[in-house]
Amino acid sequence: MQTYGNSAVTYGWWAGNSGVTNRSGKFIAAHAAHTGLIAFWAGAFTLFELARFDPSVPMGHQPLIALPHLATLGIGFDETGTFVGGSAVVAVAVCHLVGSMAYGAGGLMHSLLFSSDMQESSVPQARKFKLEWDNPDNQTFILGHHLIFFGVACIWFVEWARIHGVYDPSIGAIRQVEYDLNLSHIWDHQFDFLTIDSLEDVMGGHAFLAFLEITGGAFHIATKQVGEYTKFKGAGLLSAEAILSWSLAGIGWMAVVAAFWSATNTTVYPVEWFGEPLALKFGISPYWVDTVDLGSAHTSRAWLANVHYYFGFFFIQGHLWHALRAMGFDFKRVTSALSNLDTASVSLK
């Protein structure tokens, strides 16, 4: 984290990232615990929504988030999209809750039992995951593993659609989807993905992403930088704070894209499960409103789009904050300048 040359800098308890910056073991513990929290939310909220779900009311007209996604995947609903009971939904929720306990236990083990720094581990493979923030070889080695995991997740999604099937709103039923690896279609959908209307193209894009991510991951793991690590290549700029800022930029951008996509696309986000497409409005900031009158209620699509947008907005603000700090900008100078406005003067000499 940025210290502005002060080797004895301390942070408040709320600056959680600072406590794991140079402790790779604690860093992994925090990741595992965070994953456990996400899994717990997914499982608990799915059960909460299932308890409130009313089959007599269109799902898209109920304030639901988890159930519409499960319905899109064909979980808890038959081939025609009819609700067939909550046993499959409960099973998914319980798996997430059990997984959250396993992740939480892993976080506690890494925090309390294992070494706080992977460099001190007795396992040679573990020592490779030490944190050297200004070492591009170390950072790309870790990045490579992340990319492979993302690629495997894409493969799971593509294979689920191919073997089990997903909901196709064009026929109002669940069907198996074979991915289309037409590279010209994939290239074109970079610019019109908001209006994509073919599940084959959606799965083809994910299959192509899986190939790119796994190939890129293997490349980053196996290779090292060529030549000297100079300032032109980023020496002195690569740091924990810089990587945090880039991560926030990435997740913020994905959230904003998801907001626009979920607001209008009815192939990936079927009307049956998420409600009618939204209208974009402008006030203090952009927001989406329902195009159907539900009284004081809102569609699943409205919740999904607006929450993603505002989360994305604040993530991007966090990116700017940490990016400026990583570049050496001291925000305390701003508050200092403002506090001295009354006594500041201009000399003509």
UniProtKB/Swiss-Prot annotation:
The chain crosses the membrane at residues 27-47, 57-77, 89-109, 202-222, 242-262, 304-324. The keyword Lipid biosynthesis does not apply. SUPFAM superfamilies: Photosystem II antenna protein-like (SSF161077). GO terms for biological process: photosynthetic electron transport chain. GO terms for molecular function: chlorophyll binding. GO terms for cellular component: photosystem I; photosystem II; plasma membrane-derived thylakoid membrane. It comes from the Bacteria. Keywords: Chlorophyll, Chromophore, Membrane, Photosynthesis, Photosystem I, Photosystem II, Thylakoid, Transmembrane, Transmembrane helix. Its cofactor is divinyl chlorophyll a; divinyl chlorophyll b. It is a multi-pass membrane protein. Disulfide bonds: none annotated. It is found in: Cellular thylakoid membrane. The antenna complex consists of divinyl chlorophylls (a and b) and divinyl chlorophyll a/b binding proteins and binds more divinyl chlorophyll b than does the antenna complex from high-light-adapted Prochlorococcus. This low-light-adapted strain contains 7 pcb genes. The antenna complex functions as a light receptor, it captures and delivers excitation energy to photosystems II and I. The Prochlorales pcb genes are not related to higher plant LHCs. Belongs to the PsbB/PsbC family. IsiA/Pcb subfamily. This is Divinyl chlorophyll a/b light-harvesting protein PcbA. It comes from Prochlorococcus marinus (strain NATL2A).
